[in-house]
């Protein structure tokens, strides 16, 4: 793909706020929409070819990140895959990823309209209108986006390979667990980021780009060569290629 500089389209993300159309729950934070689209487009620019890609979030939590990218970048996507070691948030992720179809957005619009009539709150009607706008956009951009939801420990290469059976993600984009609201689970190695990268790379095609974000000044990936780094607000991000991770060794 052609070289990417930075996102120039200003995105009105109000329709994508947690709890408006997308489902939310305590303990599952949202992700900055502009940063999500910035990182995704940078990853696309690092791939060979120009066709639609498969996107995977192996620490998906509520599925918010994948759902937002699916709604904003339908034309660039072939499929999205969501996985997490904890099955608890996957129910919420399934509800959000169901919004990546016109039927799912229609159902959400009707739900919000019914709530507006029942409770007499303008905010519910506004949410219904947001669902309609998102449905119109998704339909115009290609319609329903295929999704898969699985349970897997991101530090278990065999489990990840099983999750991806029949699929070959081109882009991995995930927000690393942090602080008190989310945290690492599963068989966590002494160096979580390095372990995560090796585990992911072992299950990916060589050309795949792995993008991870964290609330830290700099995400450590050495000795792996970073394709690029960026920092927006409180989050840092780094992009690496699967082949480079494997070449760097354990």
From Swiss-Prot:
Superkingdom of the organism of origin: Bacteria
Range of residues in the leader sequence: none
Keywords: Antibiotic resistance, Methyltransferase, S-adenosyl-L-methionine, Transferase
One Pfam family per UniProt: AviRa
Enzyme type, top EC level: transferase
Catalytic activity: guanosine(2535) in 23S rRNA + S-adenosyl-L-methionine = N(1)-methylguanosine(2535) in 23S rRNA + S-adenosyl-L-homocysteine + H(+)
InterPro entries, per the entry: AviRa, SAM-dependent_MTases_sf
Function: Specifically methylates the guanine-2535 in 23S ribosomal RNA. Confers resistance to antibiotic avilamycin, an orthosomycin antibiotic.
Protein name listed in UniProt: 23S rRNA (guanine(2535)-N(1))-methyltransferase
